[in-house]
Curated annotation (Swiss-Prot):
GO terms for molecular function: asparaginyl-tRNA synthase (glutamine-hydrolyzing) activity; ATP binding; glutaminyl-tRNA synthase (glutamine-hydrolyzing) activity. GO terms for biological process: glutaminyl-tRNAGln biosynthesis via transamidation; translation. The gene is gatB. PROSITE patterns: GATB. InterPro entries: Asn/Gln-tRNA_amidoTrfase_suB/E, Asn/Gln-tRNA_Trfase_suB/E_cat, Asn/Gln_amidotransferase, Asn/Gln_tRNA_amidoTrase-B-like, GatB, GatB_C_1, GatB_Yqey_C_2, Gln-tRNA_amidoTrfase_suB_CS. Keywords: ATP-binding, Ligase, Nucleotide-binding, Protein biosynthesis. Heterotrimer of A, B and C subunits. This is Aspartyl/glutamyl-tRNA(Asn/Gln) amidotransferase subunit B. The lineage of its organism: Bacteria, Pseudomonadati, Pseudomonadota, Betaproteobacteria, Burkholderiales.
């Protein structure tokens, strides 16, 4: 069905900036306070109050602009976006419209392979239209009051950076890859804590479809407030199916705002989609134009950390990693630091093995226990020694997994935990040729049927013999040596 249709997706992402106070007032931005305890007269829109720009919010916007190679506007203006909603006391939202603080820029994404669709992993550049500063609205509480709605203005005035892409993504997988890359970037920079459950990072997806080859865009629907990568993927996939089925059944897609219901895994209509003219934007007379000179930009630039994309390129050139692996290992600053700490002890020759372990065994355990790499019970030094013992032939890969789990479970703090466990449990790999030959002779004598099958051309029989040899040594035999000696004796 979808082969006849092209999907067009653009994302608008709201990143809550990690300032201690709000964008136009001195009220706290701390999450979780009792309702309406962090709303000052400015947030309440009391008569006579005036907004004052938060310098920290501006500097975080500058950092983002520099990180994506965008133009940081030397002069931008704030506008009033007029609409009525109970949790918006002023009757308008202070935002930016005609001249945003960040203009253009791009984000490079790594889209993973899809085995079901038989598509390989690939890289794509997503161009950004703009990123602008604005204030968040308050929150309506429907469930706490019978037949009424409560208003919590703690969130009103919280600084947001709204990041808008061009409509260049062509699948839910690309949209998720972009959102994850953007999430990594803003948390890496420290401009947003990225907590999706608390609403610090949320996406609106604009989705439309058009016949393949058609230049004109189809009618789009906007899916609001998607606060998890899974919801983003599911919402887009459902919306694409809905629109295609609607058109093929003779219907027409309506421009509207929709919400995603994660329980039913479907989108539902919320309201008709507004256009810019519906908001009656005009410059806010209470705020001077935002002027950012070159010296300010340079100072902010000098304080920025090394960016994920630069580290990814270094991992590819120095360590021979694939772009996809490098992208995974820079999913957070802590992950990249952990990996580099392991490689610094192991040496570049074992960089790929370190990457495989970090993306495999380590990540598997972290996910199982819902831990961040910074909280890993196995330190980078412990993992480096473990991998060193594989490299020097002291232990096999299978035994290494057992030792890794032992260190993890006992939460060992000594760097030499690997060597201690090897000695205590007698796990040292058997590499003595004479000892291995004796074991192999016993295996061959006890498994004549497998020997005959192998000599008859059945390779599976050889694997069975290796398995028997490893079983006889309780997994401690050097697999490469067993393979070599077994083939010699069978030739």
């Amino acid at each position: 069905m979808t082969k006849q249709w092209e999907v067009v997706i653009g994302l608008e992402t709201h990143a809550q900036l990690s300032t201690h106070s709000k964008i136009f007032s001195g009220a706290s931005t701390q999450f979780g306070a009792a309702p309406n305890t962090q709303a000052c007269p400015v947030d309440l829109a009391l008569p006579g109050t005036l907004p004052v720009m938060n310098r920290g919010a501006v500097e975080r916007a500058i950092q983002f602009g520099l990180a994506i190679g965008a133009t940081v506007a030397p002069r931008s203006i704030f506008a009033r976006k007029n609409y009525f909603y109970p949790d918006l006391p002023k009757g308008y939202q202070i935002s930016q419209y005609e001249i945003p603080v960040v203009q253009g820029g791009q984000v490079t994404i790594q889209v993973p392979a899809n085995e079901k669709a038989n598509t390989p992993a690939y890289e794509k550049v997503v161009n950004l239209t703009r990123a602008h500063l604005e204030e968040d609205a308050g929150k309506s509480l429907h469930e706490d009051f019978a037949g009424m709605t409560g208003i919590d203005l703690n969130r009103a005035g919280t600084p947001l950076l709204e990041i808008v892409t061009e409509p260049e993504m062509r699948s839910a997988a690309e949209a998720v890859a972009y959102a994850k890359t953007l999430h990594t970037l803003v948390t890496w920079l420290g401009i947003c804590d990225g907590n999706m459950q608390e609403g610090s990072f949320r996406c609106d997806a604009n989705v439309s479809v058009r016949p393949v080859g058609q230049a004109e865009f189809g009618t789009r629907a906007e899916i609001k407030n998607l606060n998890s990568f899974r919801f983003l993927e599911e919402a887009i996939q459902y919306e694409v199916r809905r629109q295609i089925e609607l058109i093929e059944d003779g219907g027409t897609v309506v421009q509207e705002t929709r919400l995603y219901d994660p329980d039913k895994r479907e989108t539902r209509s919320m309201r008709s989609k507004e256009d810019a003219h519906d908001y009656r934007y005009f410059p806010d007379p209470d705020l001077m134009p935002l002027v950012i000179d070159a010296a300010w930009v340079e100072r902010v630039k000098s304080e920025m950390p090394e960016l994920p994309v630069a580290i990814q390129q270094r991992f590819v050139t120095q360590y021979g990693l694939t772009p996809y692996d490098a992208n995974v290992l820079t999913s957070s600053k802590a992950m990249a630091a952990y990996y580099e700490a392991v490689v610094s002890k192991l040496g570049p020759a074992n960089a790929k093995a370190a990457a495989n372990w970090l993306m495999g065994e380590v990540s598997s355990q972290l996910n199982r226990e819902d831990l961040d790499i910074a909280a890993s019970p196995v330190s980078s030094a412990q993992l480096a020694l473990l991998l060193q013992r594989i490299a020097d032939g002291t232990i096999s890969h299978k035994i290494a997994k057992e030792i890794f789990l032992s260190i993890w479970e006992e939460k060992a703090t000594d760097e030499a935990a690997t060597d201690r466990i090897i000695e205590a449990k007698g796990l040292k790999q058997i590499s003595d040729t004479g000892a291995l030959e004796a074991i192999i002779d016993e295996v061959l004598a006890a498994n004549q049927k497998s020997v005959e099958e192998f000599r008859a051309g059945k390779e599976k029989a050889f694997n069975a013999l290796i398995g028997q040899a490893m079983k006889a040594t309780k997994g401690k035999a050097n697999p490469a040596q067993v393979n070599e000696l077994l083939r010699k004796k069978l030739s």
